[in-house]
Each structure stands twice: as C-alpha cells, then as structure tokens.
C-alpha cells in the first residue's frame, strides 16, 4: 500500500513536469509573431489534462492522509499497541519503585533503631 502511494506521487511529479513543459511550449509559441493555433490547442489540452490529474491525485493523497491522521490506529500498524504496552511497563516500574520507597519508610518508622 505504501509503495502504491509513493508510485502515485512519482506519477504526480511526472505530470507536474508535463505541466511545466506544456506551459513553456505555450509561452514560447505565444512569443512568436505568428503563433501556431493547432499547437497551442494541443499544448493547452495537455496542460489542462495534466493539471486535472495532478489535482485529482493530490486530493486523493490528502484524503488518505486525513483518514490516517485522525488518531485511529492505521490498519496493519502495531505502533499504538506497542506504545500502550511500553507506557504500562513504565507505570508498573514506577509503581514498583514507589512501593519500595514506601516499604523502606514504613520499616524505618516501625524500627527506629536503624
């Protein structure tokens, strides 16, 4: 799934290159005294098609990122479970240390000779 998303972003990058190429060709053609109308039409269509593809794919990527960034565990991810487990272990260790301190304090109070 992640590889598919990366490939889609690589395709978007290629489409952006096509957008820039089409825009450059259009500007170059418009700078001529007599512009080739059919070339301008073809490049404009290519430009618009590429822009629409880029917009569509980026919107899809943003929707996906919005879904996975809502705090819900991502399908296939164990990060949340591992983090919860680690935090529980930390709390247990903290409780063990505090109980040890409490035990030593109680012993000192019950046995004032030490």
Curated annotation (Swiss-Prot):
Q: Does the keyword Secreted apply?
A: no
Without the gene, what phenotype results? Answer: Knockout embryos do not show any morphologic abnormalities at early stage of development. Small eyes, small brain (microcephaly), and heart edema are observed in mutant animals after fertilization. Mutant fishes show also reduced response to sound stimulus, suggesting compromised hearing, and increased movement after light stimulus, indicating compromised brain function. Decreased survival is noticed compared to controls.
Which residues are in coiled coils? 28-61
**Free-text tissue specificity from the UniProt record:** Ubiquitously expressed at early stage of development. After fertilization expressed in head region as well as in lateral line primordium.
Write out the GO MF terms: transcription coregulator activity
Q: Give a GO cellular-component term.
A: mediator complex
Q: Which GO terms describe its biological process?
A: regulation of transcription by RNA polymerase II
- Localization terms from the record: Nucleus
The organism's place on the tree of life at top rank? Eukaryota
| Pfam families, alphabetized | Med11 (PF10280)
Q: Which InterPro entries match?
A: Mediator_Med11
Subunit annotation? Component of the Mediator complex.
**What name appears for this protein in its UniProt entry?**
Mediator of RNA polymerase II transcription subunit 11
Q: Which organism is it from?
A: Danio rerio (Zebrafish)
């Amino acid at each position: 799934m992640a590889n598919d998303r990366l490939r889609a972003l690589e395709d978007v990058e290629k489409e952006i290159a096509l957008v820039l190429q089409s825009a450059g060709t259009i500007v170059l053609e418009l700078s001529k005294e007599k512009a080739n109308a059919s070339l301008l039409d073809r490049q404009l269509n290519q430009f618009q098609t590429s822009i629409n593809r880029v917009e569509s794919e980026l919107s899809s990527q943003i929707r996906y990122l919005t879904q996975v960034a809502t705090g819900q565990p991502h399908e296939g991810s164990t990060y949340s479970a591992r983090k919860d487990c680690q935090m529980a272990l930390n709390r247990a260790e903290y409780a063990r240390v505090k109980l040890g301190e409490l035990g030593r304090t109680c012993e000192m109070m019950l046995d004032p000779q030490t």
